[in-house]
Amino acid sequence: MSGYADTSFLVSLYVLDGNSARAAAEMKHAKLPILLTPFGELELTNAMLLRLFRRELSASRVKAAQALVRKDIEDGIFLLRPLAGSVYERAKQIARRRTPRLGSRTLDVLHVASALVLQADTFYTFDRSQAKLAKAEGLTVP
């Protein structure tokens, strides 16, 4: 049993927002480590830098948040796992099955496929449409 966190959840862990308290509470009950892919790490980095561009975060705050992410990976809170090539075939299968009814976005499909290929059973997200997709694919969304 393991969990997978998408970017909406990860950003809320490292950048104060309306979901930060909920993210922290979920982490207290989560079975560690939480799975993270290089794709997820990239998306998290870009989300923080986008907030810098929009002047929602200072450069020093982004640097501090990125240092916390690295520390949490080093401390084993998150386990960085590479994406196998099979994730893309799984994502195509999910897209064919779910997108016509749910209107799923490509990166949402890729996150859910990643969680499934990595054998996660719990999916942490604050994105409602992604949560619907994850639940439809049998993942538990707290």
Question: What residues fall within each predicted segment?
Answer:
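A generic local structural motif
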Residues: 20-22, 67, 109-112
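Active-site-proximal, substrate-binding regions of enzyme catalytic domains
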Residues: 45-96, 136
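Conserved beta-strand termini and adjacent loop/short-helix elements that scaffold enzyme active sites
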Residues: 37, 81-83, 142
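Active-site neighborhoods of divalent-metal-dependent phosphate/nucleic-acid chemistry enzymes
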Residues: 77-132
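Short acidic/polar alpha-helix capping motifs at helix-coil junctions
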Residues: 12-14, 34-39, 74-79, 93-98
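Short glycine-enriched loop/turn motifs at secondary-structure junctions
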Residues: 27-29, 73-75, 117-118
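Short, well-structured N-terminal submotif of metal-dependent ribonuclease cores
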Residues: 1-43, 47, 51-64, 137-140
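A general structural signal for well-ordered secondary-structure junctions
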Residues: 20, 32-33, 75-79, 101, ...
